[in-house]
Amino acid sequence: MRILEKAPAKINLSLDVTSKRPDGYHEVEMIMTTIDLADRIELTELPENVIRVASHNRFVPDDQRNLAYQAAKLLKERFQVKKGVSIMITKVIPVAAGLAGGSSDAAATLRGLNRLWDLKLSVEELAELGAEIGSDVSFCVYGGTALATGRGEKIRHISAPPHCWVVLAKPTIGVSTAEVYRRLNLQQVRHPDVQAMIDAIEEKSFQKVCGQLGNVLESVTLSLHPEVAMIKNQMKRFGADAVLMSGSGPTVFGLVQYESKVQRIYNGLRGFCDQVYAVRMIGEQNALD
């Protein structure tokens, strides 16, 4: 038997860090939404009791470092599943980009194995399991648009943002999320108004959403990696309505209301950045199929 699952990327429309917890994690408030840039996960049942992960992308690990592997291992151990599975990951989301590609692959694996192994778990139960794998996995199990709090595992669904285009550009650098958080000084950064973003989304006001974009991690990453700031400036110059870094970076996204502007922005960025994408905002939970 074979199961196919879609694993869409997410962007942060608003990302605030409110405090550091005793366990080393940070308390966050994030508005996350899914976009139409997705990996494909193919799950095939194996007769032997093993987990095999494969991908055509050489940057995708095929062992326990892979979050999809961890998702399968968690389900096997928690529910005493004696069957094996082959997990084929077709990567479309760039790796280590701040777009939750690995987390979304893990979430898709949880959803798919729930069907393949007939575990009959609810989406809420899958999301709770996802939180054991990584902070973004809970959101990715659901998809759509949500306010994430705690360390990112507490999910409250909100309306989808107004429809628009999203242009993304990822420079060829790596960003250490741990270093970004370590350098973050919560007293010296401008904190986004997360509630104002929720209100803008509920009003379906594209202009207000653009006005409330904010990421408390952005100033840290920009200070470490000037290339990210350069991409932000170029994206604005080419005509994006609003521009922000996603997650801890290095990917920058621009919101674009009118399709007529998208190609110019895309072409302009392709002149100096290899990984550029122009996709639609999804933002709805039922859009994963």
Curated annotation (Swiss-Prot):
Q: Where is the active site?
A: 10, 136
GO molecular function terms noted in the UniProt entry: 4-(cytidine 5'-diphospho)-2-C-methyl-D-erythritol kinase activity; ATP binding
Question: InterPro entries under this entry?
Answer: GHMP_kinase_C_dom, GHMP_kinase_C_sf, GHMP_kinase_N_dom, IspE, Ribosomal_Su5_D2-typ_SF, Ribsml_uS5_D2-typ_fold_subgr
Q: The organism sits in which domain of life?
A: Bacteria
EC no. given is 2.7.1.148
- Which key words tag this protein in UniProt? ATP-binding, Isoprene biosynthesis, Kinase, Nucleotide-binding, Transferase
Any keyword Transport?
A: no
Q: Answer yes or no on keyword Transferase.
A: yes
Q: What class of enzyme is it?
A: transferase
Reactions performed catalytically: 4-CDP-2-C-methyl-D-erythritol + ATP = 4-CDP-2-C-methyl-D-erythritol 2-phosphate + ADP + H(+)
- Give the metabolic or biological pathway: Isoprenoid biosynthesis; isopentenyl diphosphate biosynthesis via DXP pathway; isopentenyl diphosphate from 1-deoxy-D-xylulose 5-phosphate: step 3/6
Query: Disulfide bonds, which pairs?
Result: none
The UniProt entry, under NCBIfam families, shows:
ispE, PRK14608.1
Which PANTHER family does the entry mention? Answer: 4-DIPHOSPHOCYTIDYL-2-C-METHYL-D-ERYTHRITOL KINASE, CHLOROPLASTIC
> What function does the entry list?
Catalyzes the phosphorylation of the position 2 hydroxy group of 4-diphosphocytidyl-2C-methyl-D-erythritol.
Q: What is this protein called?
A: 4-diphosphocytidyl-2-C-methyl-D-erythritol kinase
This chain's source organism reads: Bacillus velezensis (strain DSM 23117 / BGSC 10A6 / LMG 26770 / FZB42)
The beginning of the lineage is: Bacteria, Bacillati, Bacillota, Bacilli, Bacillales
Q: Which gene is transcribed and translated to give this protein?
A: ispE
